[in-house]
Amino acid sequence: MPWVLRGLRDGILTSEWPRGGDHYFDGFDAAVGVRTDADDGEPVPRAVADAAAACPTAAITTDPRPQLDRGRCILCGRCMTRAPQWFAWEPGCGTAALTRRTLVVGQVDETDEALSALRTTLARRVRRLRRCVHIRHVDAGSDGSDEWEIYALTNPVYDLHRLGIFFTASPRHADILLATGIGTAGMTEPLRRTFDAMPAPKVVIAAGTDAISGGLIGGGYTGDVGIADLVDVEVWVPGAPASPFSLMHAILLALGRLPQNSKAKR
């Protein structure tokens, strides 16, 4: 009985995003940003060089200008400690991208025309999936943190089911392959078999830094440096781990269902 009274007291907790705004989606620090006003040929400040040397995943490069690869970034914050004038948290969970190179910030962005054409091509492929979509999740060597965020998608706050999106245990019923982990040797074949068993049209989302680049532990004797060499990836969502809202952003980006005012020049 107490939980009934508590539920009545709390009211509706489910987010209104994407139909409405959500302060957590807009205000959560889901990525690291870098200054883009540096000129080519300008000497790299010592602080930036120190930040690049301190980055545990080599996500920062300085030639010809300071750049940060969000696909490698684990959000440790070392760069912001060493070079706060150059690196800072960037609020907003709209971090997913349709191309791997778009995750590199501090460089010249792709043209709007190229990005629009890519989004149109993907939307044309998945237009039949918009109403009822099923996701098959495969853990290809994750540290477990990505899975906690994925599980949160079905809780009352995010409630992915309200959008007509569900998880399935069968790849034959799946429209989206949501892959996490570095691509360990033991999961290479199961991941490929899952992909091959899915009917067309299908979309692959690389969820988290491990799936994109291998993160901290990729490239060793146990596995690969992400899943891109194993299956064709259409959507990349960075984060260590990616937040539930970032995962939702990636799924809706793949389906062409993002709101028009979404912060997604991807």
Where is each model-derived feature located?
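Ferredoxin-type iron-sulfur electron-transfer modules and their immediate structural context
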Residues: 1-54, 58
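Flanking helices and flexible, charged tails adjoining ferredoxin-like Fe-S electron-transfer domains
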Residues: 1-15, 44, 78-164
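Fold-independent oxyanion-binding glycine-rich loops
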Residues: 17, 30, 37, 70, ...
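Iron-sulfur cluster-binding cysteine motifs and their immediate structural context
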Residues: 34, 46-103
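Local cysteine-cluster metal-coordination motifs and their immediate loop/turn environment
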Residues: 49-58, 71-82, 136-151, 209-216, ...
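Generic secondary-structure signature for well-ordered alpha-helical cores
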Residues: 127, 143, 196, 200, ...
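Cofactor-cradling patches in redox/metallo enzymes
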Residues: 148-150, 155, 164-246
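A charged, well-structured terminal subsegment
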Residues: 237-266
